[in-house]
């Protein structure tokens, strides 16, 4: 197969455009996209886009390759056990047809594709929340050739990843910004069952919320505090090049031709100017034109030069401002018919008694076709002008005849049908030859399917354990007094940077003095500043007697393999193990225990391999983790860890904690999940480790919850007390997501 790739060097860019339909696909190619990312009939993160049928996707592959462009297919959702078995069969025809790369979120999907198609390029989706060099090194062994950076990364962070790993980088340059780190959002999922991890986000972040302080006093009314402006990076080409970013990604698979092709055309203009060394100052007129194609309360340059900021937030109703109808119509007329046809040259030779000869060529490919034998004319001989007129026709092919040479012996004849057939066969053969280098004829050897993770099968079966994760130090005392808790997980979020080492040591010793195992829960997001500091302190923390670590992202997984190898490495629920393939893949990375994803329902959990899984029985689900800060954006940053609330239009209040040590916000569900009454069901499903997550609870509340668990665990209680009525949720256990 032809390597339809590129040389990743500074000052070289790929302009990557979205397309939600074949018509938009052809338009963005015409507008100058180097590559196009599309969703097929299954497994894409834009379930409500038109998307491509299998036949349309095959046509798109041919169309792109004829013009020397690339196609990336999105398989960037989380797949359940019932679905992952289909993914390789789904990809097979596109793989054989020359698919350039596949974009993935699910670690199980990633490893399954790499095992089945080892020569297919894999790009990690922004849904994998890649923020550091550690993840790049981890993924490099799985066929990953490119990482789509989390939108929150600065240009300096991207530069460091590129320089330290050599991994090809893709960054968003234009379009909508999510409030939450992509892949970490359960807001839409928990409120209405429409999961962003399944391509069905309902965007509750675009709704108004009142902001309340820690004592539930309202201080900001009906503000769009979770709604970010659209980003535009057209003025940052120099910075992106200096950072080593190769692929510039435009968001918008739900957009139509005027927006998609229009935005591509303006970026194409300034990329070409930049690459040619000319002046790249974006004119005010062009910037206004891009703005007029669509924006949400104006533009922001995103996180390239900042960690967060109130100027990125709309605060007012995030409607798109009025667009320029005349400009949109002009773009539609220019690009709706697709790219200009490919110029070809032809040579036709007609000699009596010999087979008709026709040669057609582009700049790089040439084909020769022989037709029927040329006859002596009985009546009207062929005229060069008539033959030329007929042979120059290219119809609905992608070609246009640029030059045609005709050599006709006097007095010869060939039926018009024979000439037409010669022309059609030649152009069809030319197209076939142009596409042949991209296609894969070989069929990779299928690997034997492994029903369960072999790395797990070899492990000694452990007794049941009950973990308590303490998000505040005040919760530790009742946890230590609980007879049911066997293991305590001290969350790094509960400690300030200045005192963490002393307080962690004190708390770890207190846990071990109670003959309980002590574990460390690492931060939810692991950016460069955090990584440098944590790398320094982690060996000392390990020596405090920690039995293992709870990791929440791929960067921490890679780091834990270095520091905690030989100890327990537990992945949190947001390192998603929707399917057994993911369980096996993580086990291969040294993971000893995974947390059951929060979006699986009862039947899906039962069909899952659970022998090495932990189930969260109690806790406030984190709905969003954001680099933004509700407190800082509404009251100013005071660098103090605290609690506030968001109140929606139904008067429901969602707690928000700001973690200043790591500079991120976590928005929690309004009610905690409570699954104590289902304990025996989980045991029958093979789960032996259970967990309670404490976030904002007081010591008294923590003690009451632990007592309630003990009563269910010893069989003395079968129903929840009346005072718990309407104070908890079952999460997705009884409903699940689409």
Task: Tell where the protein language model's regions lie, with residue ranges.
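A short acidic, glycine-rich active-site loop
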Residues: 49
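Glycine-rich, highly charged phosphate/nucleotide-binding loops
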Residues: 52-57
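Conserved nucleotide-cofactor-binding alpha/beta core module
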Residues: 133-134
